[in-house]
Design a protein with these regions (language model features):
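Short amphipathic alpha-helical segments at helix-loop
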Residues: 1-4, 36, 84-91, 130, ...
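Alpha-helical bundle segments that constitute or directly flank the non-heme di-iron/ferroxidase center
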Residues: 2-28, 50-61, 140-147
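Active-site rim elements
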Residues: 4-6, 91-96, 138-139
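Internal, well-ordered alpha-helical scaffold/interface segments
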Residues: 17, 42-46, 97, 104
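Hydrophobic alpha-helical segments and helix-packing faces
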Residues: 5, 12-15, 37, 41, ...
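Acidic/histidine-rich alpha-helical segments that form the ligand environment
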Residues: 11, 79-120
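Charged/polar positions within long, soluble alpha-helices
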Residues: 21-24, 28, 53-60, 104, ...
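Short, contiguous alpha-helical
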Residues: 32-78, 121-166
Length: 166
């Protein structure tokens, strides 16, 4: 196992665990609060969980040296809107269970990557077809995703984030 892939997997697991811990501690009222983009906290937690498989699919394409084609921010926004409509009332238990399941699967996939695969680069349509590495995709999407939404959730429920050393 690569030290780099292990470090990435640990960071993903840490973010997912922090998100699950926060979600579990929220009151029913906090669970239903809208974040800045209008989605409820409950929907955001489920969204992060549901995106891990898609984000990993794209990262694994780059790991294999294959381009990511046809994925645009317009498409991402459409996926998010559809998800909001379908999971606007998802239960806390369901969202947290999916978060734990999908983050564990994503971490396992990351751990299986070699340094060579992490360094493979190919055009990524989501980023103007820039030739980006698998590691960049992992850091910018599945690893960062939970932290990004944690900040939004903490802001809406009035919690202050205290950065911790890695």
């Amino acid at each position: 196992m690569s030290k780099r892939s292990e470090a990435l997997a640990l960071r993903l697991e840490q973010g997912a665990a922090e998100l699950a811990e926060l979600a579990n501690a929220l009151t029913d009222e906090q669970w239903d609060l809208p974040v800045k983009d209008g989605r409820k906290v409950r929907t955001i937690v489920h969204h992060v969980a549901s995106m891990y498989p898609i984000e990993m699919e794209l990262a694994l394409l780059l790991a294999a040296g294959k381009p990511v084609v046809g994925v645009t921010w317009k498409e991402v926004h459409a996926i998010n809107a559809k998800h909001k409509a379908e999971f606007g009332n998802v239960s806390k238990e369901e969202a947290i269970a999916l978060l734990k399941k999908n983050s564990a699967a994503a971490a396992a996939q990351i751990r299986a990557l070699t340094d060579f695969e992490l360094d493979n680069a190919a055009p990524l349509s989501l980023n103007a077809n820039a030739p980006l590495t698998c590691q960049f995709m992992l850091e910018d999407h599945p690893v960062r995703h939970s932290y990004w939404h944690l900040a939004a959730i903490r802001a809406v429920v009035g919690l202050v984030m205290v950065p911790q050393a890695a």
